């Protein structure tokens, strides 16, 4: 399924089905947290958190596609991300967009 951040799909006519969302929430690994604490002192990328964020983003997109597919969509346009923290040790990522059906 095509997922795009653009409003239009070049050369394609479609009708709008509606909004779709894909959400995931991840918790930090307490052992990786120890390494992250040290990195925050000396500086540098915290690879464990970067990987967690990438995996969360990918899962949110897959869930977005699954929801769109259930609605009979052929694509999702205007896809966006939002993220936030829940408490001190959880990260939530949502992918959202507009499900469309080709005509």
UniProtKB/Swiss-Prot annotation:
InterPro entries: UPF0145_dom_sf (IPR035439), UPF0145_YbjQ-like (IPR002765). Pfam families: YbjQ_1 (PF01906). PANTHER family: UPF0145 PROTEIN SCO3412 (PTHR34068:SF2), UPF0145 PROTEIN YBJQ (PTHR34068). Belongs to the UPF0145 family. This is UPF0145 protein EF_0241. It comes from Enterococcus faecalis (strain ATCC 700802 / V583).
